[in-house]
Amino acid sequence: VLAIHDISCFGRCSLTVALPILSAAGIECTSLPTAVLSTHTGGFEGFTYRDLTADILPISDHWQTLDIEFNAIYTGFLGSFEQIDIIKQMFERHGKCALKIVDPVMADNGQLYAIFPENFPSGMASLCEKADVVMPNITEATLMLGEPYVEGPYSHEYIEDIMKKLAALG
């Protein structure tokens, strides 16, 4: 499994959580960090952010020379439209037969993370079109679908409707 996420130095999220879980499940995991943050973006102000976009394609190029393919590619935090486009390329390069899983990390509690422009959900929706499995929270789902965010609790019918609309993305 290739896990493509950020590394948040503080906070229970991103690669620092995904890698131990996958490893404990006996799954060999390769990591590809998209950014390094001093903390995650939820609830912290003044965090540092180092974008690793410039490193992603050279890493992918090296893997391509080694004919590395993955059984699954799992994405989390992607920090830009450019990273979304690069990951689409990586789906083709390293995962033609792979299960493609996208967690469109970009929002919580009805709010897009401050780091992202208002139109970012449309870019993330374009990546979800290429995925076999998408795992948004309710905020992310409604943003990608262009629907208003509604506070829970949620009915079974509401969740089913959201899921059907997400499935129609691709």
List where the protein language model places each region.
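Conserved N-terminal subdomain of the carbohydrate kinase-like
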Residues: 1-102, 106-114
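Conserved phosphate/ATP/ADP-binding segment of small-molecule kinases
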Residues: 114-170
